[in-house]
Amino acid sequence: MTRTAKCCCGQCAIEIDGESNLNAVCHCDNCRRRTGSAFGWSVYFRDEQVRARSGPLTLYAFTPASGVGEQQRYFCAACGTTMFWTNTAAPGLTGMAAGCFAPHLLGPPTLSQLDGQRCAWVTLPDGVFIIGAAP
């Protein structure tokens, strides 16, 4: 199955082949700020699953608060939508903003990262694997 992720203005698009390797929500400050929401929702694919990229992309590179690797975040140069990212600590994987896909193309998240930082009002689907829970 081929899936297409698009930015808000439609100038950027990314085609992906196959199923994601990971479907996760993250509650860290970085993901909350990236999305402007209570958490970030991401899907990860092997680099070879990325078929095509189109549109004007801008790069923002930084070291995450964890200090692990360097993240390269790509967003639409026209509208600012975060499209995808890579991290030197996870070679061969491309993370993508799940909200850029049509909602029916992805199932619910299967992992909740840094769950101890989750907003108290956020509930998760049954069966989600939790890491980083509060002590």
PLM regions with names:
Residues 1-135:
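A short Gly-Trp-Pro
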